[in-house]
Amino acid sequence: MAFIAALGLLMAGICPAVLCDGTLGRDTLSHEDHGKGRQLHSLTLASSNTDFALSLYKKLALRNPDKNVVFSPLSISAALTILSLGAKDSTMEEILEGLKFNLTEITEEEIHQGFGHLLQRLSQPEDQVEINTGSALFIDKEQPILSEFQEKTRALYQAEAFIADFKQPNEAKKLINDYVSNQTQGKIAELFSDLEERTSMVLVNYLLFKGKWKVPFNPNDTFESEFYLDEKRSVKVPMMKIKEVTTPYVRDEELSCSVLELKYTGNASALFILPDQGKMQQVESSLQPETLKKWKDSLIPRIINDLRMPKFSISTDYSLKEVLPELGIKKVFSQQADLSRITGTKDLYVSQVVHKAVLDVDETGTEATAATGVATVIRRQPRTLNFNRPFMVVITDMDSQSILFVAKITNPK
């Protein structure tokens, strides 16, 4: 299973650009900063990230109720948090509060140190699961950027920096798209379809996740089957299946849905939410951080006699400039934006926010291992789960409890 996402923030200049030498600063985190980052209560960061993820999901799903939804809240919030390093006063507050941080309980410094530490930890090489995340700044060769901003983005977020000539928009676009394509192993080949000549800076964040099921599906068992888009329409899809698998499961009668957890080798898991026929909107409207917590706390290892799930690859792209203001992030898109901690003057605002994501789900997995508690589970009535209608997926890093990706599959074909 692979999940790939990239987000680009495009900043345009209000005033004419001023010539600068373009030297890019570099620094590293001090031991003291590392300590502070680790001291940040991980639940505070995870709680805010979860709240933002579900709030954004509702906005995206509401705009296109019958369309697939795939996005990485972590990639989006990482880019916006980096942007907030360059923002001041109400512009900065809007960004961080829009990301669901309570600034009366957590300081800006703690947010950056905690977030930076989280992204560093996620990118540590691991044998069992591949998570690759990073950020890059593409700065116009004639745009003065404060060395303090460059140093902080490098020290806290390991953001790479490149000089671009936005007066040659096609060349600049190729530079950015080639970078993103390379970092996402070719899965996202074109993050930007066009750039404006007055672009001063582009901020990019990408996140690539590749996980192997702890209990894999056998490719020889995959067969063609119906996936019901609604009560009247269906499409043929390759359907994976596995029999007699023990995995965490809960039935939520109140919300009319079944919830199944499939674990990856390593420290990630996927929560699959299968609403009863016609109940997707009911489940979506009830989605809150408390709902996810209730499901996770209620999961119990159960024998699933017959589990069926479509094999698919879907991609989505969003312009978030219209969506983020609905979450309170408004000023940064206007000429009243104060991004003076980037340039020293109020000459920048955000003109585009582009997010693209790709989700691949297949049978791939390592050697199957029995789930904990198999011997203690009492078999009752046969339990079958058939994901042959719209469902949701939430992929979480278990160590930090951070949501990496959220998806709704309405049509896997």
Curated annotation (Swiss-Prot):
GO cellular component, one term: extracellular space
Highest taxon of source: Eukaryota
Record-marked site positions (Reactive bond): 379-380
InterPro entries: Serpin_CS, Serpin_dom, Serpin_fam, Serpin_sf, Serpin_sf_1, Serpin_sf_2
Segments of this protein annotated with the region RCL: 365-389
GO molecular function annotations of the record: serine-type endopeptidase inhibitor activity
CDD domains membership: serpinA3_A1AC
Endpoints of the signal sequence: 1-28
Post-translational modification: N-glycosylated.
GO BP term (any one): response to cytokine
Primary location: secreted
Family annotation (PANTHER family): SERINE PROTEASE INHIBITOR A3A-RELATED, SERINE PROTEASE INHIBITOR, SERPIN
Name of the protein described by the UniProt record: Serine protease inhibitor A3L
Species of the source: Rattus norvegicus
Gene name in the database record: Serpina3l
